[in-house]
């Protein structure tokens, strides 16, 4: 049995951990289908040599348990700051055979209560200059930050550098840099990037929290001179519109900068082989100058004058005598917190699939795929030549960049980059440092592919997909090309919206709207490992929550909204939905402690918004039903309220707050009763079955698919009426001609209901998806789209929205047939798509315990071949409908002669034949 994939819940990287409570996890692999973990031991030590025998930090001892996730480590004395810790897992199987993991490590920073402070205090005569009144007088110097925020006092991008001469002849063992630059920064050491990250640090409410990043630069550190360089741009911290499009200022000018001075800090921790340690900090000894990037508008307008670029500025030997000393700055108000979520990195490279000269000096390049990108342009020409680079998801009939929504024409002409050539080398290369967009098309003006023109020459145009570094998890493929194309469009829509937060679109808005976070979580967890992203989003929600308990519709809240665009439970519910989803998908309760009280405050706030004894109906309803504002407020919002209360009760139980569990359980039961009192129609005078109505048209008893789906999926239907409500749901589908009659909220529960084992109508799902006219996914694809649009319309402002992507969940759970049952897929169900039109389906889900693989194929003889890989430490329940039985491929111990009986498949690989 091999111990693999060791990690720490809530942390993607581990170079700067700032908490004394960690939760470990690991996975196992074994070719023995009977192998089971029966015990484990975890050791943690600052001395690698004592890890097994005398760990100096923590030793779990041998624990009789099969648990592999959510293992709490909380040393009595905490962890020392700026220290490398090693940890290892030993497991024993049922035969007392032991296996050890490789040695893992993490590096600590400072306690989360610490923050950088203003460099000078009014009271510095009486107190240390790094103090803030009394607090840091009593703070252990080893446990607090020593660096100060620095910059040049301006709000335009800057370069900062620090030359470090050797201070010791001792051998360097490890070099770690903690740094942050607001809004975003790139760090380099000796002329090379410190990491593959882009857009560090993650976006937060900088008044509350500022993320710092940890970099291990040991391999780049020299025993001679060293140079640390930082390039800092605006981001959302000090957003710079320039003369371009900037969404927070587009309609109502409610954006307020967090700060007006771009700022940076760094601590470089150099550890020597004799155990000594020195710290190099950001202070006025650093040098600063303006950047060659003259505008860093995060909405993809990033100007760059290559003539101003100081070649070699971040490497040893550069003459910085004309640079100015950095100024100490006050910096942001927020506390420093380690960037725990996955960084943003560059993924796929796109090269143009076609190009077209629109007119002399203007060329359009088609990348073939819409996605979130950072473009890369290689051009050469005379110094001072200006190149304009535009981006678009759409082109007009002539092939020029185009915004089809007339209300957003400013986006068409107001988003561009001006690149001024240096003309001193064979090629001038530009790629953005501080911005990104979503685009399929890149239009270049002022240059030509024809080297005989009197214009600068375009040598290369490419683009890199930019997204979170979170682990990619799987795929689904069928024998239907239109379905595969839709799966692909969903994937690119999701991947293009995952950064340090989950946004709804990477070009027009870039905001952290919370409904996509919670609504799409069951689908997104098939795209990427989202645990650390969701944990960070919950931190954003805590920072954004208002004093009365309200959770706004976005976090961070970069732009103040009002009315239902500010207060809607289908957005705010992320505070109560995400913790339970993290437990369900990743087997961790790490977030419960920090989010529990904020959840209670939100429920108390929502109680003040109840009407008619418990209904909630003040929000956006089924947003996106008719382009924007929706309906079914009482049905949707009250159902979500009910589920929030149930989730808080579950958290209370997990945390041992039994009185609270009883309180919220009773509260939820009250809402259940009120919901059915006002919305369930049982008299059968208008229809021969019970059904749910909306309150959209008082006095009428409408019967819609969304009203039935919400009640069914949230467990609000009394058992005696469940069959009736399913009948009402299918009747509503039939009455619509199997057309989608749902906005983005109802859409998810529409698909979930059609996948419900008691309904199981994949034919209706595909008929809805394939409609000729909107609402229709396939209409998007027939018109050449490669991602999902914002609304059910052709001329849409945003063509890389993921909010309509809830059907992606259906592809995994109802087509591939894989669905988690126990936490983290410890047990999972497999429901092969017997009732569907698919002849072949295959796919993978890289679950927390290991890789799940499924291949379903109908044969010419009429039976089905089903290949299944069940990871170690998990059990699959193969769900068979009536009339289906396994005729070969089962080991003797799980043989069954019954027809239509669920089969428990223990870990292992199976090649089954099923007879229909």
Model region roles, listed by residue range:
Residues 174-179, 189, 374-393, 442-447, ...:
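Alpha-helical support elements that line or immediately flank enzyme active sites
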Residues 184-186, 195, 235-239, 396-398, ...:
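Flexible loop/turn segments at secondary-structure boundaries
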Residues 185, 193-196, 200-201, 541, ...:
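Active/binding-pocket-proximal capping segment
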Residues 183-184, 283-290, 449-489, 495-496, ...:
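Active-site acid/base region of carbohydrate-active enzymes
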Residues 1-84, 88-508, 516, 532-535, ...:
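Extracellular/oxidizing-compartment recognition motifs
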Residues 228, 304-305, 509, 519, ...:
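C-terminal capping/lid segments that line or modulate ligand- or cofactor-binding pockets
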Residues 256-267, 277-313, 339-341, 348, ...:
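Non-catalytic C-terminal accessory modules of carbohydrate-active enzymes
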């Amino acid at each position: 049995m091999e111990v693999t994939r060791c990690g720490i819940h809530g942390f993607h990287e581990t170079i700067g951990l700032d908490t004394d409570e960690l939760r470990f996890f690991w996975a196992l692999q074994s070719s023995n289908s009977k192998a089971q973990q029966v015990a484990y031991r975890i050791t943690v030590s600052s001395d690698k040599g004592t890890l097994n025998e005398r760990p100096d930090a923590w030793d779990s001892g041998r624990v009789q348990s099969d648990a592999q996730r959510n293992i709490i480590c909380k040393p009595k004395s905490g962890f020392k700051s700026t220290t490398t810790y090693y940890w290892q897992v030993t497991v024993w199987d049922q035969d007392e055979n032991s296996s050890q993991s490789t040695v893992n490590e993490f590096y600590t920073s400072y306690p989360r209560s610490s923050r950088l402070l203003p460099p000078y205090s009014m009271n510095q005569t009486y107190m240390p200059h790094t103090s803030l009144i009394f607090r840091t007088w009593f703070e252990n110097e080893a446990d607090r930050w020593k660096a100060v925020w620095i910059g040049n006092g301006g709000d335009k991008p800057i370069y900062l550098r620090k030359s470090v001469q050797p201070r010791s002849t001792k051998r360097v063992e490890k070099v770690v840099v903690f740094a942050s630059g607001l809004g975003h920064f790139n760090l380099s050491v000796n002329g090379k990037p410190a990491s593959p990250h882009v857009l560090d640090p993650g976006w937060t409410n900088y008044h509350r929290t500022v993320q710092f990043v940890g970099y291990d630069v040991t391999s780049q550190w020299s025993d001679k001179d060293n140079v640390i360089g930082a390039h800092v741009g605006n981001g959302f911290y000090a957003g710079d519109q320039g003369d371009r499009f900037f969404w927070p200022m587009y309609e109502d000018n409610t954006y307020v900068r967090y700060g007006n001075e771009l700022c940076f800090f760094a601590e470089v921790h150099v550890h020597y082989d004799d155990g000594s340690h020195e710290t190099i900090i950001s202070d006025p000894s650093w040098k600063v100058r303006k950047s060659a990037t003259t505008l860093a508008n995060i909405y993809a307008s990033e100007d760059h004058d290559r003539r101003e670029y100081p070649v070699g500025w971040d490497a040893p030997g550069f003459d910085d005598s004309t640079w100015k000393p950095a100024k100490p700055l006050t910096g942001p108000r927020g506390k420093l917190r380690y960037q725990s979520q996955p960084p943003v990195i560059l993924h796929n490279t796109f090269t143009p699939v076609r190009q077209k000269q629109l007119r002399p000096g203007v060329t359009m390049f088609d990348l073939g795929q819409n996605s979130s990108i950072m473009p890369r342009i290689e051009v050469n020409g005379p110094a001072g030549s200006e190149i304009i680079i535009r981006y678009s998801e759409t082109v007009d009939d002539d092939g020029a960049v185009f915004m089809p929504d007339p209300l957003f024409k400013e986006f068409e002409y107001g988003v561009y980059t001006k690149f001024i050539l240096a003309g001193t080398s064979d090629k001038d290369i530009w790629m953005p440092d501080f911005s990104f967009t979503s685009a399929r098309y890149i239009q270049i003006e002022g240059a030509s592919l024809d080297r005989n023109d009197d214009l600068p020459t375009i040598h290369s145009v490419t683009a890199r997909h930019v997204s979170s570094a979170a682990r990619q998890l799987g795929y689904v493929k069928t024998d239907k090309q239109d379905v595969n194309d839709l799966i692909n469009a969903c994937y690119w829509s999701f991947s293009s919206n995952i950064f340090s937060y989950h946004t709804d679109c990477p070009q027009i808005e870039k905001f952290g709207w919370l409904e996509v976070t919670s609504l799409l979580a069951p689908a997104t967890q098939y795209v990427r490992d989202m645990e650390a992203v969701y944990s960070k989003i919950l931190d954003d929600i805590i920072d954004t929550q208002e004093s009365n308990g309200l959770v706004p519709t976005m976090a961070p809240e970069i732009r103040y909204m009002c009315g239902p665009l500010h207060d809607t439970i289908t957005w705010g519910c992320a505070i109560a939905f995400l913790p339970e989803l993290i437990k369900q998908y990743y087997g961790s309760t790490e977030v419960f402690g920090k989010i529990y009280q904020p959840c209670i405050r939100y429920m108390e706030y929502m109680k003040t918004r109840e009407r008619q004894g418990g209904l909630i109906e003040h929000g956006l309803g089924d947003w996106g039903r008719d382009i924007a504002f929706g309906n079914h407020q009482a049905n949707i919002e009250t159902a979500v309220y009910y589920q929030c209360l149930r989730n808080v009760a579950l958290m209370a139980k997990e945390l041992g707050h039994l009185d609270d569990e009883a309180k919220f359980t009773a509260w939820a039961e009250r809402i259940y009763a009120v919901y059915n009192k006002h919305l369930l129609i049982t008299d059968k005078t208008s229809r021969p079955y019970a059904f749910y109505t909306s309150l959209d048209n008082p006095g009428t008893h409408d019967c819609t698919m969304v009203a039935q789906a919400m009640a069914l999926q949230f467990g609000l239907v009394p058992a005696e009426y469940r069959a009736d409500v399913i009948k009402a749901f299918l009747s509503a589908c039939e009455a619509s001609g199997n057309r989608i009659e749902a906005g983005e909220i109802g859409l998810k529960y529409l698909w979930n209901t059609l996948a419900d084992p008691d309904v199981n109508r994949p034919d209706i799902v595909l008929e809805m998806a394939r409609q000729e006219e909107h609402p229709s996914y396939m209409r998007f694809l027939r018109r050449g789209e490669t991602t999902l649009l914002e609304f059910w319309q052709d001329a849409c402002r945003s063509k890389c929205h993921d909010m309509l992507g809830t059907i992606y969940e259906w592809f995994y759970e109802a087509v591939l047939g894989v669905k988690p049952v126990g936490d983290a897929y410890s047990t999972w169900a497999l429901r092969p798509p017997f009732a569907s039109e698919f002849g072949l389906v295959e796919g993978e889900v890289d679950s927390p315990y290991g890789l799940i693989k499924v291949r379903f194929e109908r044969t010419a003889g009429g039976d089905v071949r089903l290949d299944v890989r069940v990871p170690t430490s998990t059990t699959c329940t193969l769900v068979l409908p009536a009339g289906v039985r396994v005729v070969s491929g089962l080991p003797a111990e799980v043989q069954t002669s019954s027809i239509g009986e669920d089969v428990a498949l223990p870990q292992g690989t199976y090649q089954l034949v099923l007879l229909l």
